[in-house]
Amino acid sequence: MTNLRKSHPLMKIVNHTFIDLPTPSSISAWWNFGSLLGICLLLQILTGLFLAMHYSSDTSTAFSSVAHICRDVNYGWLIRYLHANGASMFFICLFLHIGRGTYYGSYTLSETWNIGILLVFSTMATAFLGYVLPWGQMSFWGATVITNLLSAIPYIGTTLVEWIWGGFSVDKATLSRFFAFHFIMPFIITALVMVHLLFLHETGSNNPTGLNSNADKIPFHPYYTIKDILGFVLLCFILLSLTLFTPDLLGDPDNYTPANPLNTPPHIKPEWYFLFAYAILRSIPNKLGGVIALILSILILIILPLLHTSPLRSLTFRPFSQCLFWILVADLITLTWIGGQPVEHPFIIIGQAASILYFSIFLILMPLAGILENKIMKM
């Protein structure tokens, strides 16, 4: 009798994905973030489901329903803060996953990479919708400012914004639809994750050398299932430390004030994981130009395969490109810091310089470094 996991139609899919999957023997801990993202997604769906049972998507009761969850529901405070800080962990893993893909040239697997970028946009949209739901000051004004950006679209902009709002301002209709979309989006993300994995398993994983590893592969289980447990334990430790000791560390104090359309907070800003894109948006004085730059800050990842000028896939053996990569990381940290600062001197000029450097590294410096390294290798 054949093994059930190799003969049963459903078990076969699981077997080919998590058990007998041929995996390069040289992949490092940087390849752990895919499975960690899966765990984060599962955690967000479960905690979100329990929060949705007690949440009210009406403007008059939304804020008090979140307070009710934290005060009266059994372990409601834990579920709420696991969900909020789980989103932060999700984005930390996401940024590290993209960083690893950029460093090791995983963007050459174009279908997997493009679905991944679609996943980034979906995750960012979901996080934005979720940030509006507690209906605090920053929720309301964040929703107003970010949705208002669509009015920069020529001709249809204003109509589009009013259509999204369901009226002439962010109100009850907006909150109801944002809650509905926030609920459905994680399931769309889960479907996209399956497509992402499907394309990945068509080509096989990349590895730190960037070379073909068909001659040296090992089964995923038990080697990488055991290895992934370490990442899982670290993720749980960081998430629980955040949730139990400093649950509001990454949040905004303004969100503990109920939404008030008549009182604008002194500094409107999104969650920390959007600050780099927000800084790029603010660094351009023109509204439409800022919106285009905001979208391009993520969309630029799509053209990375076209900007790849080196015969080597990974940056492991490319010192100039490595320097540029770490300058890019420092630049992103600078942009994140600038996004959280008020719009005044010297933050404006620092943000503009960091934004120019961000696009220059991708579009000009990285391709030039690849060409230079080619010439040095041929000498």
Swiss-Prot record:
The encoding gene: MT-CYB
Transmembrane regions listed in the UniProt entry: 33-53, 77-98, 113-133, 178-198, 226-246, 288-308, 320-340, 347-367
Cofactor(s) essential for the protein: heme b
Binding-site residues, heme b b562: H83, H182
One GO BP: mitochondrial electron transport, ubiquinol to cytochrome c
Recorded topology in the membrane: Multi-pass membrane protein
Protein name as it appears in the record: Cytochrome b
Gene3D superfamilies: Cytochrome Bc1 Complex, Chain C
Record's miscellaneous remark: Heme 1 (or BL or b562) is low-potential and absorbs at about 562 nm, and heme 2 (or BH or b566) is high-potential and absorbs at about 566 nm.
